Amino acid sequence: MKLKFIAPLMLLGMMAACQGGKQEANSEQSTETADTTLLEVNFGSKVPDDFYFVEYVNPRFAFHCEYPSFLDKGEAPANGDGRVFSNNELVITVYGEYDELGNADIKKAFAAAKSKTDTLQTQADNWYKICGNDNHGNTYCRKVVEVDGAFATVLATYPTHFANSYAPIVNKVMDTLSPLTPSEE
């Protein structure tokens, strides 16, 4: 599915700048984005004024998500684990992995993934999302979804000073990460 996004919208940037302290939640929080969503872009970042989202499907691990069209698509590994999409500022890594013990447990995975640098920690029945800032001036955001004994992951990183441009885009990518339905497989 291709969606067209238009720029700018200052309100999203101000809302992103106001987020700060650590947040924890144990119930699912979903933010749906309408097809006509306006996103703030271009404060020195490499985000074009007009772009759309492209669907990525991982048949090996039975999940899909959407990524922005302005990112370069890296080569697919021979084993079909995932893909890297980047523009040298925003890097989105999408991959699946099997739980080595064979008992995928999103609660245990969430507990093990938490860090003191996290500013957002959200966990629901079959997924978790963790975001924060590292010591190198970057923002990271990881969403992991449990899919039939495996984990589907989206990891996004970008320079924190481009948060106004990239945070809304990354949130859209994270929101679209989900298992394939039987009709999609």
Positions of the model-derived regions?
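Positively charged n-region of N-terminal signal peptides that target proteins for export
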Residues: 1-5
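Short, low-complexity, disordered segments immediately C-terminal to signal peptides
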Residues: 19-42
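Short, low-complexity, Pro/Ser/Thr/Gly-rich segments in the mature regions of secreted, periplasmic
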Residues: 171-185
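Conserved polar/disulfide-associated segments of primarily extracytoplasmic proteins
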Residues: 74-168
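C-terminal motif of bacterial Sec signal peptides marking the signal peptidase cleavage site
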Residues: 14-17
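Coil residues (strongly favoring Ser/Thr
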Residues: 35-37, 119, 176
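Proline-anchored loop/turn motifs at beta-strand termini and strand-loop-strand connectors
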Residues: 60-76
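Short, compositionally biased strand/turn segments
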Residues: 34-57, 185
